[in-house]
């Protein structure tokens, strides 16, 4: 690691759970960061594979490593990160989130911090910076140069409506400033994911900045695989029960997704509604009410507030029918 005297300290938060296999590689990549001063805070969520013991070993040999013990038990990933963010909020100026199984590229902190300072220089406000990722397999072999291209994700424009409806930000690439932490914390129970919540607050009362360059080797393995291919043909009759079951499952999943994002929108309205533009506030308030509506009113609201031209006719129709 190389540092400069002017480099601000970045507090890194990492929630762990049974991550012993890849944690050492993550730590090596953190120590290799260019022009960066950092501390890392871990919170383990009840691992039984030796993760906690490995974290204690890291902490015993490097004063920059801290393991928090808050006696809250298993919280799940969203609220484990929420607890970490809350823990560092009183002292941190800048915070990055990290996933236990990823590897950071050496320039990650340097270019993210440069963009942060540019954004803060234009207008002091809550800022979230995020980047593209390079997709790799479990052994770090290349899969795709761009996660955004692989998943057809367009990070811009980052409007309130887009961010409320779709998670545009990947937590492992995020850098946030103190002004955003002051607005976003504590992470509410209604948050779908901690990174989604941070992005929603940032776009509502500050700035979301996207860097079109990978800074993370995004490891795909097991349940983490992106866009796993399915067989194109398995025999229509054999697949009929599967298709019926899938249709029912997708309908339930679509409904849950709408309700979860609507509940998160309600929490967003309560947190920063007064500082939103009138148009954004009208959208967030209306969208947050969807779970309380009857069938016809719900369909109309989904058509009005959830469907978007960029999704295409079929996706919008499916969303309205299933939602």
What are these regions (language model features)?
Residues 164, 190-192, 196-197, 217-323:
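C-terminal subregions of glycosyltransferases and related glycan-biosynthesis enzymes
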Residues 2-231:
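Nucleotide-sugar donor-binding/catalytic module of glycosyltransferases
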